[in-house]
Amino acid sequence: MKEAAVERHFVWAVERAGGKTWKFKSPSNRGVCDRIACLPDGSTWFVELKTKGGRLSELQKLHAADLVALNQNYACLWTTEQVDQWLLTTTR
């Protein structure tokens, strides 16, 4: 499955759960997360989407560590099943 298919499923699943998601692009900062998701419970998530077997670049790992250090919600999801499981656990 391609990363675009995982991303489409992510958008669909978040919207179906009543949330909103936006593509996150920062022209001057490479390696930022793919999506920002705002969920109905008021939480905001920075989400990186990959294909199964995909790897985070060193820059993506650095950005992820920065977000976690700032006490932000961060997730890296590799499959549509992981997207569904993540959504189940974050919207309880």
Briefly describe each language-model feature range.
Residues 1-92:
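Catalytic phosphate/metal-binding cores of nucleic-acid and nucleotide-processing enzymes, i.e., regions
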